[in-house]
From Swiss-Prot:
Annotated transmembrane regions: 34-53, 77-96, 118-138, 145-165, 173-193, 241-261, 289-309, 355-375, 421-441, 446-462
Name of the featured protein: Protein transport protein Sec61 subunit alpha
Cytoplasmic side: 2-33, 97-117, 166-172, 262-288, 376-420, 463-476
One of the protein's GO biological processes: protein targeting to ER
Domain of life: Eukaryota
A GO CC term assigned to this protein in UniProt: endoplasmic reticulum membrane
Role played: Component of SEC61 channel-forming translocon complex that mediates transport of signal peptide-containing precursor polypeptides across the endoplasmic reticulum (ER). Forms a ribosome receptor and a gated pore in the ER membrane, both functions required for cotranslational translocation of nascent polypeptides. May cooperate with auxiliary protein SEC62, SEC63 and HSPA5/BiP to enable post-translational transport of small presecretory proteins.
Organism for this UniProt entry: Bovichtus variegatus (Thornfish)
A Pfam match: SecY
Cellular compartments annotated: Endoplasmic reticulum membrane
InterPro entries: SecY/SEC61-alpha, SecY_CS, SecY_dom_sf, Translocon_Sec61/SecY_plug_dom
Membrane topology (UniProt): Multi-pass membrane protein
Family, per entry: Belongs to the SecY/SEC61-alpha family.
Statement: the UniProt record of this protein carries the keyword Glycosyltransferase: no
Length: 476
């Protein structure tokens, strides 16, 4: 059935826009240039407002997910990377459940990637229609069919640009992937803004700066009671405070520490005697993939819940899925779940919220740990990183594990890789929960993604430098 499905979509994949693989080795400085160009295009799209929208001031149901999904409300990047990640989630679940089978051949892998791109484009159109028809930009009946269609076209073209930018980097023209680059940029931008944002907000305590560090100096300079000023700077509510910033730095340090955990399996050359090496199996074997897929799952659940609650607010089943309320605190208008499944799958707002509703906290922890472990375990099967795939790669490189024959390598690798994938996913989920409870800036998931992505870029840089030999030769 799997091969039939891939063969069925083959004609559609042939007409999709595609980035050709480079015909020569791309130098590091060229990769840096292409990466910078890709990032520049993304940031420009984040600032260009959608033409034709009547209003984007209503409560934002995806406020909590925007940092993770690299989206910016009311702009061309309204959808962010959500369509790409959602299509990856769907294809992974289909492959993991054996509904479709992906072979080891390059042809099957190419068809699988093509199917993922096709689904990404379909999801982009679907999400654009949902956003417009649920009134996120104004009443569709007042805007008219022409304006609604124009907004949908803008969102689709922007989504296609994101798909192609991601493929550009994935094909080897740049560093890393577009998804990782956009997420890390968005999260780092949020952290810097929450720390140094110069905008002022009128609160019950008076006018305060949004940035936690600027607010510290402002409070110390304007308040006569310095001890109370320090207390406010560290613990103020509804605005970034210094404890949030300290929690963010702490989570950064913990994740970087865990990045170093790995098991080195001794391998040797089957051709040349005396040539030994090691194959590292990291604790975060699947890196940040589990948390990205988990975020995609939750964000799509939010989309469906918001769409249904807008149309059928009194329905019992709709309320069971999620009941939403608009935030009454200072800051941007946002909607948040107050009951139903969406509420229990959303992180508690603070440690105080954990004490107020421990059932919510327990369900959220179980969901995070379970979903991350599941996605991590299934991802290795469809991404070419399972024990069978690793054994095949070592065999192609004429390497064998010391003390084991070629035939027993898969069995030995199976002792480590699935365990590392599941336990690593569990740790990723646990660290995300810890960051949420500590109140880290940008959400626990966002911080975790930022650290793992920055670490990936650090590893890429070190690898490129070791191949060239010196820093000067790498950049000039």
């Amino acid at each position: 059935m799997g091969i039939k499905f891939l063969e069925f979509i083959k004609p559609f994949c042939a007409v999709l826009p595609e980035i050709q693989k480079p015909e020569r080795k791309i130098q590091f400085r060229e990769k840096v240039l292409w990466t910078a160009i890709t990032l520049f295009i993304f940031l420009v799209c984040c600032q260009i407002p959608l033409f034709g929208i009547m209003s984007s001031d209503s409560a934002d149901p995806f406020y909590w997910m925007r940092v993770i999904l690299a989206s910016n409300r009311g702009t061309l990047m309204e959808l962010g990377i959500a369509p790409i990640v959602t299509s990856g989630l769907i294809m992974q679940l289909l492959a993991g459940a054996k509904i479709i089978e992906v072979g080891d051949t390059p042809k099957d892998r190419a068809l699988f990637n093509g199917a993922q791109k096709l689904f990404g484009m379909i999801i982009t159109i679907g999400q654009a229609i949902v956003y417009v028809m649920t009134g996120m930009y104004g009443d569709p009946s007042e805007m008219g069919a022409g304006i609604c269609l124009l907004i949908i076209i803008q969102l689709f073209v922007a989504g296609l640009i994101v798909l192609l930018l991601d493929e550009l980097l994935q094909k080897g023209y740049g560093l890393g992937s577009g998804i990782s680059l956009f997420i890390a940029t968005n999260i780092c931008e949020t952290i810097v803004w929450k720390a140094f944002g110069p905008t002022t907000v009128n609160t019950g305590r008076g006018t305060e700066f949004e940035g936690a560090i600027i607010a510290l100096f402002h409070l110390l300079a304007t308040r006569t009671d310095k001890v109370r000023a320090l207390r406010e700077a560290f613990y103020r509510q509804n605005l970034p405070n210094l404890m949030n910033l300290i929690a963010t730095v702490f989570v950064f340090a913990v994740v970087i520490y865990f990045q170093g955990f790995r098991v080195d399996l001794p391998i040797k050359s089957a051709r040349y005697r005396g040539q030994y090496n090691t194959y590292p199996i990291k604790l975060f074997y699947t890196s940040n993939i589990p948390i990205i897929l988990q975020s995609a799952l939750v964000s799509n659940l939010y989309v469906i819940s918001q769409m249904l609650s807008t149309r059928f607010s009194g329905n019992f089943l709709v309320n069971l899925l999620g009941t939403w309320s608009d935030a009454t605190t200072s800051g941007p208008a946002r909607a948040y779940p107050v009951a139903g499944l969406c509420y229990y799958l959303s992180p508690p707002e603070s440690f105080g919220s954990v004490l107020d509703d421990p059932v919510h906290a327990v369900i959220y922890i179980v969901f995070m740990l379970g979903s991350c472990a599941f996605f991590s375990k299934t991802w290795i099967e469809v991404s070419g990183s399972s024990a069978k795939d690793v054994a095949k790669q070592l065999k192609e490189q004429q390497m064998v594990m010391r003390g084991h024959r070629e035939t027993s390598m898969v069995h030995e690798l199976n002792r480590y890789i699935p365990t590392a994938a599941a336990f690593g996913g569990l740790c990723i989920g646990g660290l995300s929960v810890m960051a949420d409870f500590l109140g880290a800036i940008g959400s626990g998931t966002g911080i975790l993604l930022a650290v793992t992505i920055i670490y990936q870029y650090f590893e890429i840089f070190v690898k490129e430098q070791s191949e060239v030999g010196s820093m000067g030769a790498l950049l000039f």
